Amino acid sequence: MMTSIILGEVLSKSAYESAMESILDRLAQDGDVAHEDNSFWQAEGERICEYNNLIKEDKKAEPSEILKNLYKENYDYKMVDDDFIFPVMVHNYLKRHDGTDDFIDRTVFSSILNKETNNKKNIMKNFNKVITSALPYYKTWKQLSSEEKERVSGKKSLAEKLIRIKEGMNAGDWRDSDKGLGGGVYSGNVNIYLVPASLKAIYTILKREYSDELKDIAVKNNLSSLLDILNSFSGEEKKSREMEELIDCWSQARKHFKVSLSCDEIRKRLKFFIKENNLLSDYDRNIIKELPLTVDCKIKDFIEGQKPDILKEGMEFYGISLDSECKPVEVMNSDTGFGFLLDEMDIKEMEEAVKIASLTYPRRLMTAGGLLTANPSVSEDRNLWKFLTVTSYHGTVIWSWQMTMMEKGLLYQAKKTASINKELSDKMRYLATELIKIENAIGEMRNFELWTIKGDKDKFIAVPYGEGSETESNAVQLWSTVSLSLLNPFNVP
């Protein structure tokens, strides 16, 4: 889904519709979006393994049920991010193809229901799911709204109402490896960027499509959260105060994830990381110390006491997740790409995000091999150093689609802010250009799903990730074509 959003105008109308239809075809009755469908040979392989395990455990009854469903598609609903990406996808489609309601009103055959259904009804089921999921945080926020804003945003009782990964799971978003969220249970990219973006998309669509028909759909399908919002619409402009409050509330949810470090604290933590991290070789330690932090200050100069201008005010970033105690998991990460592309950052946040992306690893995210997905170097938690290494699937590595999302988001915001903040616009354009140059320099590796880094003389360079990297990219996987989006980067995404 994110790939379709990133590709945007590069995709034809019919291709975009095909992507949405495949999502709607796998939609659960409650509007939950399937992350992946393991169909045909994949589902068959999984069930054969399950069958063999049950036979080994001498369970007689259950294997026969598995054989009955041997070739049935196996839908995976364990992720939470998909539910919030889909409304943005629908919104972008309607914005790009204004006046074309044929897809929304289309009658289709559902393989899950095994009968005909309607796209509009299924889209509204998803919207209801999103609104329902967002309401607990909003209701708690309203109850606490008489207190000072900063105190409210920091309250654990409020943070506990954020969107949590599903019980018993270790992942809930695109970082779907066991430790991809650093052990956290509240995903940063979901709560900071995707929920507000999805609510804004839903509100725009409901204003556009508002009718008695929508209310009928909500009533007939028991979509109570959606119906409440529709009933709150008033005036000729069809506005909903409740929906606007819901959006405003969620736009402030990012405060829970904020990490603020002074210059001295950064120095202390970075020194600790370089000295105590036994996963670093002496060779890599020496390279790190010699890396330029700024033009006239190396990493070793900084940890020995030099204070470059760019760090005098310290730094702020959003943690990769919140742990079970609702404390930020202090890992710098590339998820700000969602913020740039989905228009979910203000000027100050963009300035800080550009700073984080621009400076060299281990101080920030930039390497000669590309933009790092995660960097735990300023965390005092040694476990995070182990969870997010250069060999971890979602660790100190580079993901191709994340690079492209960042590049396209930066170029989009550079154009948008050119007339109001030229200095920031130029910085974003420069950073995007540098990232594109890096990708061009690493050659065919840029088409891999991901790659990692290793120390080489005076920098960290791109190297293939694990085994079989060359076979990870193919045309069936839409993300493999994501770099095509940069053929026309300045259109609104």
Q: What is each residue range found by the language model?
A:
Residues 1-493:
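Acidic, mature catalytic/reactive cores of soluble proteins
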